[in-house]
Amino acid sequence: MSADITETPNKQLLEQIRSPSFSLFNCIYELKNHTDSIGIQHELVKKLYSFPYEDLQFFIPQFVQLLVTYDSESMALEEFIITYSSRYPHFSLIVFWNLQAYIFELKNEPESRSFQAVRNLITKIQNIMFNADQQTVKAPEFRENFLPALVLCGAVASSVLLPSFKSYCLPMIKAQGKQQKSLVFKLVNFQKSLTKNLTLKNQRMSADIPKGSHSDDETATSSSIKPSLSRSASVPRRNTKKTSLSFSSDESEAYTTDDDDNKTSIELEKDFYKIDLDGLSKEKSANFLEPEENLNVNTAIKSKKRLSTLTSKVMTQPWNGIDGYNVNSQSLPDLSKAEGRDLIPFISSTESETSLLYHNNSISNDLQKNIPRQQKFSPGFDNVYLTKLLQVNYAKNETQFIMALQNISIRLSQVPKEARLSALRAELSIINDTLLPSEIDIPQLLPITSNRNKKYHKILKLNVNEASVLNSAERVPFLLFIEYLSDEIDFNPTTEYNQRIIARKKMNGATSMTVKKINSFSEVADGNFEKENKIKSSTPETVSNIIYNENTEEADLSEMPLDRKTTVSSDSFSPEMLVTPSITEQSKLSNFPSLNTKEVSTKVLADQMRIAAVMLQQLDSSGKANSEQSFLIKNRIVESMIALQDQFDSFDFEKLSQLQSDEPSAGERKLENDFKLGEDWNTKKQRIKKSSAYGHLKNWDLCSVIAKNGDDLPQEAFACQLISMISNIWKKNNIPVWTKRMKILITSANTGLVETITNAMSIHSIKKSFTEHSIKSGENSKGKIFTLLDYFHSVFGSPNSTSFRTAQQNFAKSLAAYSIICYVLQIKDRHNGNIMVDGDGHIIHIDFGFLLSNSPGSVGFEAAPFKLTVEYVELLGGVDSEIYSQFVYLCKQCFKSLRDNSEEIIEIVELMQKDSTLPCFNNGENTSVLLKQRLQLQLNDEDTDQFVENFLIGKSLGSMYTRLYDQFQMITQGIYS
């Protein structure tokens, strides 16, 4: 295997790989081009370990794409991903979420090599993330692979004369030896090509066979996987034959298991966080765990009694007594059986939180009394294991938090618009009560402040009062403000804070203590609840106390909208009940707390809002939502929700309410959203800090994100990645232009978190707000639309002032950069709602739903190379001004720099377009070909300058197509041109 890398044609490549100038991009490029050479693959992956972690994390989507779509016998890249996932928790999370997106994309091809590769890798990643005992579980060093064994024999023989050869080839032999039989994947594709029609027939036959009557494992697998993966991860099940499952949070996780029996023996009763009860083998003794032990975040607790029995069995197992474990057969490890067997860690204060007052410290004191010192760190628990225990705790908390956010948008979409804000506040309050504060941060989005300290941030709470639902025509994105402590947590088991986490987890495992449920959708596993009274400030009169009571635990509430067996399910909540409400129903409506109700806890408010949201949802789905009685009931529920909403801390929505209408246009929605985002960031941050119970902590900080869902999120993330790469090229070549580095964290195929742009407003909102204000004040009787130049005058002063000149130059530098980016990447839909201006005068493009191959309405309406209006040129001082000449010069420099480094952009697009279903790759393999053509690589420098000035700028300046598109958006969507 190593011979192919030392042959004469590859000697030059080997020298390049070992050269210090060999970049990370070069590694990715060569990995794509040498998938058939195991030796070259291993040498390239060996080079990957020499690059900084931040650069490797940036290219995670490309690494996953290489593994999924490029067939290779090499195990090198997979071993690299597994190694880094074990070493860096953020790396494993991002890989995990990217794999979830691929699972959804490949849901209709479960027999394909790509699907099998994704399932195999996601199983290993989940084992790393959720299995604390994995260091005692060793996969077979060698499988039934002839070639690695043969090379190993040769290495042993050659070591007599070449002792160093063994150390050189041993890593490659060990990696290849772990590979499953390559024949398996070949047979899968071979079978698929020969029996395509027969497979479709078998699927239809399997659908007619009753459950449990499968005579053969293959048929059972085919019949269980395919239908299960046919649904979006964010769409609830409404009509399903499995009445025990009414709602699933993410199907891409639920169907990655190899254990077919689990699917038929488990009844799914709760969504979002559920425990697989068949992790223990019924045929094996209680001294070790079943090889198919699963952590399935979407499986349910079937019965409290059964879980209690299972827990008592698990607690008798020695920590290091796992034997015969097959990592490759595992899907999600069972959260109920991992380290301590609790569902969430005890939420205690870190060193930075010691100044907070607690009303009840009895739990902490009891634990300190009852846990012997030697129990915390017994000889069997070395630091490696304890570190892994902390990392697993972090991974659990992180995935639970992200899934909770994912499901909020889904539920908000089922609530009337006028009640969405109330429902959002209720959902966020429940997350605060059940999950936070905890060992959670947001990879990629929360700012990195101290790489040297290797510490992570800790989310304290979601600010309920500042959160808002963003207005959207189709989906329901919402804005979050997250309070966190920077550089707060790590995985060092010797710190006092981490010792408390470990001790409490051991305490829970040793005494089978019941644990309160993780989130608003999980079921309480046992009959007893651990009461934890948390006070969030030393001034309790300013913060609502959180009450934990067995009678008001959300478990009962969450059963209402999710379990079809409950009284509020779609089966029992009939249309007649809605049209003619009973006395009981009327009393429920009348029992909503009024505006004058005092001392109502946050939890009670959240519960009441959840009930109201469920009733509204059932009302709309009853089929009689348009009747007069239903209309009256709906109004009554909405009024109650608004009353409940006002019982949270106050928030000024007076101006916002003036903007709202029954069916707002896109322009009105954009202005409304900009109002929510437009407040000066530092002012908002200081205001929230003063009102926060945690604001006095020295490392307190605030960030804002937008939770979105939609099919174009992976495409937007890819566009942001391309823009970052282009910006890096310009920075490396010292070209003084400016772009905004936007970040999008993909958490599934159609959900994610988007970094917000602070201190900026869309050009549409600027024009609309200034124009309407001038009309109302009598200064603009003719209704003339304000221009950007008018805006710059009002914000930055006179044209001769230093602030105006600085803002003008900032506008020119950013305009040049985004102009070239829009042309090269063919970014379309460039109306003024998708272009922003920040507080320094920079222009910023957002919303990259159309690029490379696709355009709005599949019509090439925007035929100009990029958007360069007469208004932009007017702001630059006209075509004869010095600033305009600077803009033209920067455009030329940017374009020539991209041409000189064109292989980076072209190759990344070529890599990602293979077998992709993203709309931006509608042209297939021609996508990268057309990109290369746009860069005009055949031109010399002089001709390139002429091309930029005469073609790109000349055809864009005042283009008729641009004016027509802006007018079209103005007429149809109300977006100012």
UniProtKB/Swiss-Prot annotation:
PIK helical domain mapped to chain residues: 1-125
EC number: 2.7.1.67
UniProt-listed SMART domains: PI3Kc
SUPFAM superfamilies the UniProt entry points to: ARM repeat (SSF48371), Protein kinase-like (PK-like) (SSF56112)
Predominant place of localization: nucleus
Region G-loop, residue ranges: 685-691
Pfam families per UniProt: PI3_PI4_kinase, PI4KB-PIK1_PIK, Pik1
Region (Activation loop): 845-869
Region annotation (Catalytic loop) ranges: 826-834
Composition-biased stretches (Polar residues): 220-233
Uppermost EC category: transferase
Catalytic activity: a 1,2-diacyl-sn-glycero-3-phospho-(1D-myo-inositol) + ATP = a 1,2-diacyl-sn-glycero-3-phospho-(1D-myo-inositol 4-phosphate) + ADP + H(+)
Transmembrane spans: none
Keywords: ATP-binding, Kinase, Nucleotide-binding, Nucleus, Transferase
Entry GO terms, CC: nucleus
Sequence ranges of Acidic residues compositional bias: 250-261
Annotated GO biological process: filamentous growth of a population of unicellular organisms; Golgi to plasma membrane protein transport; phosphatidylinositol phosphate biosynthetic process; single-species biofilm formation on inanimate substrate
Misc. comment: The C.albicans mating-type-like (MTL) locus contains, in addition to the genes for the regulatory proteins (MTLA1, MTLA2, MTLALPHA1 and MTLALPHA2), a and alpha idiomorphs of a phosphatidylinositol kinase (PIKA and PIKALPHA), a poly(A) polymerase (PAPA and PAPALPHA) and an oxysterol binding protein-like protein (OBPA and OBPALPHA). PIKALPHA is not represented in the genomic sequence of strain SC5314 because that haploid assembly includes the mating type a allele of this locus.
Protein function: Acts on phosphatidylinositol (PI) in the first committed step in the production of the second messenger inositol 1,4,5,-trisphosphate.
Protein family per UniProt: Belongs to the PI3/PI4-kinase family. Type III PI4K subfamily.
Protein name: Phosphatidylinositol 4-kinase PIK1alpha
Natural source organism: Candida albicans (strain SC5314 / ATCC MYA-2876) (Yeast)
Gene it is expressed from: PIKALPHA
